[in-house]
């Protein structure tokens, strides 16, 4: 059983995966709030409470964090609470198997790397990955499995909350599809701007990528896959996305763990 931990700016996804390679599947998943000042002990108590008896069946752990302070605590937690379980943290120097053809590879978020790795592993062709999180990341993978870069925009919830926070006449609203793109009240107007506006943003970015990037035109076979917590809200309004994979990031973490498994085994033998 593999424990996968995906720490983002606002929420953390904890998953358990059974099996390896093409037989691997997510059997449990939880979503909890990310606390930037959380300690290793607090993390361990939370995760151990979630996974229960499966804690004794762990064969490995893979984790990423877009919050550096939390990544540090995750490392301490794994060393202290599961010292005999091999683990991989996605950070510079870890083998991912995906070339990063960008100006500064160290700047690329671990979440973007594992998403693209998982998309290429699943479809085995050029891909555009759209991750709907606190930011919307639209990333590009070549037909050779190379990370070519991408675009980052503010997330749907973040943008809606910012509009409410900076305007005396607006308030925070539930993210839901309104009756029409033409809202009849303030809540519906904000929902229309969030849902239809960001669907148009994503379709526009994907369309520009297909126009501007060699090998991604409409004449080429390109997988366009969405993931992320708010993706289901926008999927019905998107015209460019072909696939939705709720577990894309967790599967990407598994792939990185498997690619580093031999290295981990070597470290364990040395430790003995």
UniProtKB/Swiss-Prot annotation:
It is an enzyme of class 2 (transferase). It comes from Mycobacterium tuberculosis (strain ATCC 25618 / H37Rv). A monovalent cation. Ammonium or potassium. PANTHER family: TYPE III PANTOTHENATE KINASE (PTHR34265:SF1). It is found in: Cytoplasm. The gene is coaX. The active site is at 111 (proton acceptor). Pathway: Cofactor biosynthesis; coenzyme A biosynthesis; CoA from (R)-pantothenate: step 1/5. This is Type III pantothenate kinase. Its EC number is 2.7.1.33. ATP binds at residues 6-13, 134. Substrate binds at residues 109-112, 186. GO terms for biological process: coenzyme A biosynthetic process. GO terms for cellular component: cytoplasm; plasma membrane. K(+) binds at residue 131. Belongs to the type III pantothenate kinase family.
């Amino acid at each position: 059983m593999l424990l996968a931990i995906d720490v983002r700016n606002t929420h953390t996804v904890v998953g358990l995966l059974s099996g390896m390679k093409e037989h691997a599947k997510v059997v449990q998943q939880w979503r909890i709030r990310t606390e930037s000042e959380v300690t290793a002990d607090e993390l361990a108590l939370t995760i151990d409470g979630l996974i229960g008896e499966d804690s004794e069946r762990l064969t490995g752990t893979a984790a990423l964090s877009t919050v550096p302070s939390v990544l540090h605590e995750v490392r301490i937690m794994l060393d202290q609470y599961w010292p005999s379980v091999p683990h991989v943290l996605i950070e510079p120097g870890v083998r991912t198997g995906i070339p990063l053809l960008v100006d500064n590879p160290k700047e690329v978020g671990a979440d973007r790397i594992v998403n693209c790795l998982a998309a290429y592993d699943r479809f085995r062709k050029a891909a555009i990955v759209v991750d709907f999180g606190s930011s919307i990341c639209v990333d590009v993978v070549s037909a050779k499995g190379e990370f070519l870069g991408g675009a980052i925009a503010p997330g749907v919830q973040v943008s809606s909350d910012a509009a409410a926070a900076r305007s005396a006449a607006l308030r925070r609203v539930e993210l839901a599809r309104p009756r029409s793109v033409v809202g009849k009240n303030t809540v519906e107007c904000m929902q229309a701007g969030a849902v239809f506006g960001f669907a148009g943003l994503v379709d526009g970015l994907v369309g520009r990528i297909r126009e501007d990037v060699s090998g991604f035109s409409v004449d080429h076979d390109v997988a366009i896959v969405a993931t992320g917590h708010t993706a289901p809200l926008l999927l019905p309004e998107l015209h460019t996305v072909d696939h939705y994979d709720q577990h894309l990031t967790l599967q990407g973490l598994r792939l990185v763990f498997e690619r580093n498994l031999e290295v981990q085994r070597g470290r364990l033998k040395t430790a003995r």
